[in-house]
A protein has these predicted regions:
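A conserved ligand/cofactor-binding region detector
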Residues: 1-815
Length: 815
């Protein structure tokens, strides 16, 4: 288009915002203001704000194109973004302006923000980390984009019915998603099944089933900068919408059967994998993400450069965990089959562009796929994986000619218990960099899981300790504390969290400590009001708020927390008139729908809560609350209110954790094991300002190898014996006394895999130290303030800068 293009740029004044909101409501949403509901007003406000973001977005895109920069493409099955409006207002600095505009229109901004659904694009720490990283990429002006799936229903909505988790569809798109741009012209065919046709040295993948991936783009705003990036999500569509012949014959279900089958790929996050069909759907889902993404990356590169010669110089593809590892054979397939690369050239490029983050060392959590299943669905990719494996093993064999045990250990194909493809092995063999997410995790990674690979490729492995974005997790989630920090050290900590260290001299002043305490109390009152309104439970904000919020999993040891709660309950019952530090134990988190034990733990928590909360002897000395349907928006209310943060995983099991960082940043003290990033947090905040308990990773391993006997702990510790016997005998489930016998057996008789009983006494004794300190409020708040002041290292901005410099080799765009 060569003709001059003019438009009226939307301004940021209050009057302009009012006009824009009214215009959007009437002419985009098509609603009469006199009858519009809150959702419609919210969408109008979102669209008005989005308009003001688009110019920055297009300017960033133009700058990336004109400066011909190297870009990173971040692939993740999850992006747990949280609500968009508050974050956008914060980034643009127009929160007060929009608040005033809506107020003058008779509307309340905070009420409208509560109407926004959390996007159902993730589940736990993996997805939230990806979201923090996108925020930091944009804020630092680094060229990159995220790629994920636009799930129709997210994971699930968690309801608690009779104390048990019940799952229902999380239809987060119920009122639309005005923040996204649907790209009707950006579609790619994704193929499954079929057969291979050999034509000389070339291979054709033919007679495949096809579905279409359509792009949906979301703007990722940088904070206080024109720099913005894109999150591109793929939605599945049938290649043929409807079988008209069958429809006209009256067979209406058969007419749309193919369409529904195709679109199932982007219906839900992590379909239940307890059945073969569920596992197959997961595999299709992972391939759907990577196929559309890699095609898009190559298409964008060709449009910009019209050559493949510089492909490895211009793109970096990062794999967030093993779910997107099929991107490796997909890139090889496209380069060889579609773009006529030789195998060697394709492999060289592939090794140069990929990097991989490992998020777990637990063998049961490392993805493997049966060779038969991949062969059925992705036959071409299976042949490429075999070729990569053969090439790799032959190369290593030249150096270790007779070490067949080594060959078996490092082979991408696991020949034991049925042939399976080890996705983490494939990622490590091909990626030029592999990183862990905390110093402890990265050390364990090269000492245990990838020890053979670390010996072969010592320069390939590195550490990038996780971080969190201070914009969402402090500035947005905790305005009361942010105001205290602003008064003390100014506002620029939002983009340079290391400035929090400037708080240290202020900690000697009682007035500053009092301000920190006042902010905490305001946040506790806010949470207590939310719980009263939504759960009809009364909490005392003067009590110590003891919080464990994360997905429910045995290694995260919510059950250890419950054992302490029961012990505390027993002590109160034994001496109800003593001066107890009042406590509120808060739990939240989802259990995977097929994870029976985790769901059983939720049931136990609620049964224990029911018993304790209704015991007249206990009253306000102890309360237990399980808050359902945990997500980002709930976390933004709960985390600022916490006094004590529970980070109690078995040492050596949590790769990093990020909720530990969020809690400390918001002035909670941590009780935790020396696991994940807790180790580095202790180094930064000081050992005296964190409550560490339990066995270390070497001690855990020593117990395991020497023969751990949990029954010994059960029989020798009277309080532990009492708590476990109460669980087993039905004290908390009198209507079904044997309900939790299996949990008791797992701990006492069947090995206690995560060593709860070994750490119980240390944990309970450390909780007594927590009580002792909480009785000294000034000292408690002083230590909380020291935690805040020393959390600057744990910014996602620092993490992303390290990735940019040492793994991706990308530089900021000049705007």
């Amino acid at each position: 288009m060569n003709a001059p293009f003019t438009y009226a740029s939307p301004t940021l004044t209050v009057d302009a915002l009012k006009h824009s909101i009214a215009y959007k409501l009437m002419f985009t949403i098509g609603k009469d203001p006199s009858i519009a509901n809150k959702h419609e007003w919210l969408n109008a406000a979102l669209l008005a704000v989005r308009d003001r973001m688009v110019e920055r977005w297009l300017r960033s895109s133009r700058a990336q194109l004109s400066q011909d920069v190297r870009q990173v493409y971040y692939l993740s099955m999850e992006f747990l973004m949280g609500r968009t409006l508050g974050n956008a207002l914060l980034a643009m600095g127009i929160y007060d302006d929009l608040n005033q505009a809506l107020d003058e229109m008779g509307l309340d901004l905070s009420e409208l923000m509560e109407e926004e659904n959390d996007p159902g694009l993730g589940n736990g720490g993996l997805g939230r980390l990806a979201a923090c990283f996108l925020d930091s990429l944009a804020t630092l002006g680094l060229p990159g984009r995220g790629y994920g799936i636009r799930y129709d229903y997210g994971m699930f909505k968690q309801n608690i019915v009779d104390g048990q988790q019940r799952e229902s569809p999380d239809y987060w798109l119920e009122y639309g998603n005005p923040w996204e741009f649907q790209r009707f012209n950006t579609r790619y065919k994704v193929r499954f099944g079929g057969r291979l046709q050999h034509e000389g040295s070339r291979v054709r993948w033919v007679e495949t089933e096809e579905i279409v991936a359509m792009a949906y783009d979301q703007i990722i705003p940088g904070f206080d900068t024109d720099a913005t990036n894109t999150l591109r999500l793929w939605g599945a569509q049938a290649s043929n919408e409807i079988n008209l012949g069958k429809f006209n014959q009256g067979d209406y279900f058969a007419a749309v059967e193919d369409k529904n089958h195709s679109e199932n790929v982007s219906r839900v996050l992590y379909p239940d994998d307890s059945t073969y069909s569920g596992r197959e759907l997961r595999l299709r889902q992972e391939y759907f993400l990577v196929s559309a993404t890699v095609q898009d990356i190559l298409n964008r590169h060709w449009q910009m450069h019209e050559t493949w010669d510089n492909l490895a110089d211009k793109i970096a593809i990062h794999l967030n965990d093993t779910h997107p590892v099929l991107a490796i054979p997909e890139l090889m397939r496209l380069l060889i089959d579609e773009h006529k690369f030789t195998w060697d050239d394709a492999f060289e490029v592939t090794c140069q562009v990929f990097s991989y983050t490992n998020h777990t060392l637990m063998s049961e959590a490392l993805e493997t796929w049966p060779v038969d299943m991949i062969g059925k669905i992705l036959q071409r990719h299976l042949s490429i994986i075999f070729e990569i494996n053969d090439y790799f093993l032959k190369t290593i064999q030249d150096y270790y000619p007779d070490d067949w045990d080594l060959m078996a250990r490092i082979s991408i194909i696991d020949e034991n218990d049925g042939r399976r493809i080890r996705m983490a092995w494939l990622a490590v063999v091909v990626s030029h960099k592999v990183n862990g997410v905390s110093e402890l995790h990265s050390n364990l990674m090269v000492q245990s899981l990838f020890a053979d690979f670390a010996r072969l490729f010592p320069g390939r492995f590195c550490n990038k300790t996780n971080g969190v974005t201070p914009r969402r997790w402090l500035a947005l989630a905790n305005p009361a504390l942010s105001e205290v920090l602003d008064d003390a050290i100014g506002r620029t900590w939002r983009t340079d969290l290391a400035q929090l260290s400037e708080l240290v001299p202020h900690i000697d002043y009682p007035a500053f400590i009092e301000q920190i305490a006042d902010a905490k109390f305001a946040n506790k009152k806010r949470l207590a009001e939310w719980v009263a309104k939504n759960m009809d439970i009364v909490l005392d904000p003067q009590a110590l708020f003891d919080v464990q919020i994360k997905r429910i999993h045995e290694y995260k040891r919510q059950l250890l927390n419950v054992l302490h709660v029961i012990t505390r309950y027993n002590r109160i019952k034994a001496d109800p008139t003593a001066e107890w530090v009042p406590r509120v134990n808060i739990f939240a988190g989802k259990a995977a729908s097929a994870y029976y034990v985790a769901k059983h733990i939720i049931h136990l928590i609620n049964d224990v809560a029911n018993e304790i909360n209704n015991d007249p002897q206990v009253k306000n000395k102890l309360k237990v609350v399980f808050i359902p349907n945990y997500g980002v928006s709930l976390a933004q209310i709960i985390i600022p209110a916490a006094d004590l943060s529970e980070q109690i995983s078995t040492a050596g099991t949590e790769a990093s954790g990020t909720s530990n960082m969020k809690f400390a940043l918001n002035g909670a003290l941590t009780i935790g094991t020396l696991d994940g990033a807790n180790v580095e947090m202790r180094e930064h905040v000081g050992a005296e300002n964190i409550f560490i308990f339990g066995n270390t990773t070497p001690q855990v391993e020593k117990l395991r190898t020497e023969g751990y006997n949990p029954r010994k702990y059960y029989e020798e510790d009277a309080e532990l014996h009492q708590a476990l016997t109460q669980i087993a005998s039905g004290v908390f489930s009198p209507q079904e006394p044997g309900r939790y016998r299996n949990l008791f057996d797992a701990l006492v008789n069947f090995g206690d895999h995560y060593q709860l009983l070994a750490d119980y006494r240390s944990y309970v004794d450390t909780q007594d130290k927590v009580d002792k300190l909480y009785r000294q409020p000034e000292e408690w708040q002083r230590r909380a303030a020291l935690n805040i002041a020393n959390m600057g290292y744990f910014s996602a901005d620092r993490t992303i800068q390290e990735y940019a410099d040492e793994i991706w080799h990308i530089s900021p765009v000049r705007l």
